[in-house]
């Protein structure tokens, strides 16, 4: 019987949780079903103003096409926009390609994004800053950014970024971390080795190719736990690293809107209004808690 219950829960999770989004709006429970569309899912709103194309990445445990319910940020994005009358076409892409598509106007919204500084240059539009190409929403819940080191290795980060000078640090390609850290990186005050994903970052640290890596600890741990490594390799890798010093920063998350999207300022205002409503009504926390527990068996 327990096996049957487990299988039913497993099938239900993959068949339904990943296809529908449920949220509370104006004291009413709303459910919107996702329909296969192009290379993603389309969530249609009644009397839709228009369809907005969101591009995102696999970034578990926040959001991933491989999570049983795609993660709370996925549900949150659909709910926020649907509550404002927008249909949503949501597509998973490699991060660098997602950034490129939104900056070039091939998609409307990039999320979840960290705060983008005015001085951050675009990698895809020559002589342009990213903020010239993208509008940034108000913030929503994110996570800490920390340095990880090998266990038993001397601590490097003292709380002052100056302590990083001369070190070799692993970073994920295309990510912004903090303005101060990124400025030091651009000035080559420490050596950088880029990784294509969080698992590769962890492996760089384990292999002693870098002194530290920077990232969200929950994302880094998840990248190992749900990788294709065998169980012994996972345990060995996770047990070999630890946080170096206090968190560097708490990074909130944002929606980034292409300024090539028609009436992008109106879309930005609608998103900010929904963020305010969701936060003050408690719907943001409810969604996070509900979706995070949804696939627990």
Language-model-detected regions and their locations in the chain:
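Classical Sec-dependent N-terminal signal peptides that target proteins to the secretory pathway
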Residues: 1-18
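Extracytoplasmic small-molecule ligand-binding "clamshell" domains
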Residues: 21-123, 194, 291
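Extended ligand-binding regions for polar small-molecule ligands
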Residues: 21-32, 74-82, 151-154, 167-168, ...
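Acidic, polar ligand-binding/catalytic clefts
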Residues: 23-25, 91-163, 242-248
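Periplasmic-binding protein-like
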Residues: 57, 139-145, 231-269, 296
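Bilobed "Venus flytrap"/periplasmic-binding protein-like clamshell domains
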Residues: 57-61, 66-79, 147-187, 193, ...
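Short helices/loops that flank or line small-molecule/ion binding pockets
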Residues: 96-110, 184, 199-227
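A ligand-binding cleft/hinge motif common to bilobed small-molecule-binding domains
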Residues: 113-128, 211-249
């Amino acid at each position: 019987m327990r096996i049957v219950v487990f299988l039913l829960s497993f099938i239900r999770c993959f068949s339904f949780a990943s296809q529908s989004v449920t949220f509370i709006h104006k004291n009413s429970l709303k459910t919107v079903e996702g329909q296969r569309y192009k290379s993603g899912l389309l969530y249609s709103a009644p009397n839709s103003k228009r369809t907005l194309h969101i591009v995102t990445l696999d970034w578990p445990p926040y959001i991933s096409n491989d999570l049983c319910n795609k993660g709370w940020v996925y549900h949150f994005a659909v709910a926020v926009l649907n509550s404002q009358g927008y249909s949503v076409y949501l597509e998973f892409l490699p991060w660098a390609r997602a950034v490129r598509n939104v900056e070039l106007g091939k998609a409307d919204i990039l999320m979840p994004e960290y705060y983008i500084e005015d001085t951050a240059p675009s990698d895809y539009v020559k002589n342009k800053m990213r903020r010239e190409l993208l509008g940034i929403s108000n913030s929503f819940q994110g996570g800490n950014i920390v340095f990880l080191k090998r266990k038993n290795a001397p601590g490097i980060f003292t709380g002052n970024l100056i302590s990083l000078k001369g070190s070799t640090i692993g970073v994920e390609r295309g990510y912004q971390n903090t303005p101060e850290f990124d400025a030091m990186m651009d000035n080559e005050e420490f050596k950088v080795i880029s990784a294509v994903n969080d698992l590769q970052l962890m492996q760089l640290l384990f292999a002693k190719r870098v002194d530290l890596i920077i990232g969200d600890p929950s994302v880094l741990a998840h990248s190992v736990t749900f990788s294709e490594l065998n169980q012994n390799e996972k345990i060995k890798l996770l047990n070999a690293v630890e946080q170096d010093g206090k968190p560097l920063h708490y990074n909130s998350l944002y929606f980034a809107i292409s300024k090539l999207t028609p009436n992008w300022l109106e879309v930005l205002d609608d998103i900010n209004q929904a963020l305010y409503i969701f936060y003050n009504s408690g719907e943001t926390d409810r969604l996070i808690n509900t979706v995070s527990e949804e696939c627990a068996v």
